[in-house]
Amino acid sequence: MKNFTSFADAGDYKALLQQALEIKSNPYGYQHIGRNKTVGLIFFNPSLRTRLSSVKAAYNLGAQAWVLNAGADSWTLEMADGAVMNGGTQEHIKDAIAVMSQYCDVLGVRTFPTLKDKAEDYGEVVFNKILQYATVPVISLESATLHPLQSFADLITVAETKQKERVKVVLTWAPHVRALPQCVPNSFCDWFSEIDWVDFVITHPEGYELDPKFTKGARIEYDQKKALEGADYVQAKNWSSYRDYGQVLQNDPAWMLTPEHMALTDSAKFLHCLPVRRNVEVSDAVLDAPGSLIIQEAGNRTISMQTVLHELLK
């Protein structure tokens, strides 16, 4: 593993998953891997789980970690190549990332889409510049299109709780008060459509189809109730339209996940990446039910990051 930005970087996912489960069973047993190593973490947008779990993961491996909030804690960064920097920006991303690479052994970066320019967002312009200028391995802490550490944590959660060899996993769209990016659902599809013991179904209103390159191999069902029938795991998440980029085409509250929806499943466990708008995306009754795995899932964010750091630092 040279960098970690998508499912493709996981390589043999079964081996990586087994490593994660071993690390979870003995989280402090690999501190020789991180001894005298430093993990750099750069955030271009707010974070709770990613920030804290990444720091914890580094410490668990015996490494140190530093955190930088781009812009707030640093000079304002210029992204454009060949820019004449006579305006508000004070340091070029080319110089900043090269310098940060001097201060760490692996660099975690969190960027975010504008939801205004599909070509720019899906071209991963900012993240690719960081990959270009970094001289150490780079981990995606979320990018404009993907959130691989979250999806890896989801996979760990399903793997450690499943009660049968094959499971049906459903990703359902949910309403929200604002337009959200497609990073989490894209990544969930990127991972779960490739898992050979998962029957993967995506359900959403028409017009909310995700980028087909991430949904290949999945069954798409526009009838939410039909999709939920017999499910073993349900992941709820809002996203804005990919086709009509960044737009909220409709926000039907009937898509909010309730106990009535969950009753259609095979006593399914519930997943959500958090943060969640309670009683907008998902009802309290689902979030607080015994079958809700949201806290265990969040805890596994440490394990997913720790496993990736283990691979990159060993």
Language-model segments: which ranges?
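Positively charged, low-complexity intrinsically disordered leader regions
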Residues: 1-52, 56
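Phosphate/diphosphate ligand-binding glycine-rich loop within oxidoreductases
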Residues: 32-40, 47-159, 277
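Phosphate-coordination loops involved in phosphoryl transfer and adenosine-cofactor binding
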Residues: 33-39, 166-168, 267
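Glycine-rich phosphate/diphosphate-binding loop of Rossmann-like nucleotide-binding domains
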Residues: 44-66, 159-237
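A short helix->loop->beta-strand "cap" motif at the edges of active sites that frequently abuts
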Residues: 134-136, 197-198, 263-269
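Rossmann-like adenosine-cofactor binding region
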Residues: 213-292
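C-terminal helix-to-coil terminal segments
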Residues: 288-314
